[in-house]
Amino acid sequence: MYKTILVNKQNKIKESYLKKIKLINTKDINNKDVLIEKETYENYLKLKDFLKEKNIEIGISSAYRSIEDQEKIYNEFLEKYGEKYTKTHVAVPYTSEHHTGLCLDINVKVNGCFPKDNYALEKQKEYYESIYKYLKDFGFILRYPKGKENITGVLYEPWHIRYVGVVPASIIMNNNWTLEEYLKEFSGVIVINKKSGPTSFDIVNDVSHIFGIKKVGHTGTLDPLAEGILIIAIGKATKIVELLTSKDKEYIAEVKLGFCTDSYDTDGFILNKCSIPDNLDISNVLNSFKKTYMQEVPIYSAVKVNGKKLYEYARSGKNVTLPKKEVTIKEIELISKNSSSFTFRTLVTKGCYIRSLIQDISKELGVYATMSRLIRTKQGVVSIDKSNTINDLLNNNYKILSIEECLDYPIVIIDNDDRFKVTNGVRLENKWNIKDRVIFKDSNNRLLGIYEVRDNMLVTWKNFN
């Protein structure tokens, strides 16, 4: 369940979400029962204890509300405060954040007492403002900040906090954003140093939930056995996935000699064994693969043949003709070797399977070989030293790259006239003598788009508005 779910006048809460909420019962400031989403409550207690050490005492006046609860509150406000006040201060059913269980109306105890009504509550704004700087450390944001009414559609509510998780909360509060702005504007590239075990999809799913962003994708699958960089695009950065996927990739591979498996790696079943000859000329054989050739795709891969993935054929025991792809081995060198294994580094083009490369090398060596370890160390201009672990993300200690940092295109800052043209996808004269593609940014360093040369004119390739 995404903690960044957006509920407002334009985005009504769905019944499917309401069925999934895990609620727990606690007491509000009037000692009445109140329900709160479990993780939200756990972090609220941490915030409450932290503030208590600073002599600030807070309590909950409202949390989760059912659709029926919201209808009742709306009608009560209508009767007590009138239509004008109610429409600007109370959400109609299905559009209230309180349906999520993730938001809290908190009260501050002043002179030993909590406020008795809404009028008294509004007089305490200065007390609320003193705690805002602490919210993000516990995963909360001020949901309806001052000066953002045109974005949220709700008047400033100093008492209304919302749990989104520590990582999104830090980004939102540091950028002075609302939740709406975060979900629209936040984008970038996260480089994950994947450990052996999880699938690429597992990592994408983790990143998606940590940031609370659904629009997430990776730029080149790593097998479960493989390690190293998995480049993950978030938000608008997903527009450049195809660019990053097409970049050359560098790997370090470890190879075991004397046996082969059905999957070409040590995760598979052993098919054949052999003795290992002495004095294998591994270095020269590797060097002979510095070329372009047609490589056979391994049976254990996600490549489709007749609408079916190859690994599905393998698992069902059905025969299939394996397709071949043109690949280029740009660089390859021996790093180390012993009597039963060797390690090499290689730089290859898109679509090259290192497992298949090792099988081709083994045929030239005249000995069975199997990949025992694979580390992707570089993809395009992005290297492993720019990577993060999933724990780095969870600990809110990570580096996110901008779109332009991941591309090796020239960057041009344009004036307002050209800015208007770029944002509207207008063709431009190639007055900058661009040879391939160019990244356009405005004077505020905002990324506008990527243009490419076509018939000596510059035309839109990707627009980021």
Task: Show the residue positions of the predicted features.
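Extended alpha-helical targeting/anchoring segments
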Residues: 300-330
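A common structural junction motif
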Residues: 137-139, 288-293, 363-370
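Structural signature of FAD isoalloxazine-binding scaffolds in flavoprotein oxidoreductases
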Residues: 242-257, 320-334
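Acidic, low-complexity central loop/insert segments
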Residues: 243-294
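Accessory RNA 3′-end/elbow-binding domains used by RNA modification enzymes
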Residues: 186-195, 201-222, 226-229, 247, ...
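Extracytoplasmic cell-surface/polysaccharide-interacting catalytic and binding patches
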Residues: 1-185
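The conserved catalytic core of RNA pseudouridine synthases
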Residues: 206-213, 231, 320-351, 355-366
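Residue-level signal for inorganic ion chemistry
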Residues: 232, 253, 307, 357, ...
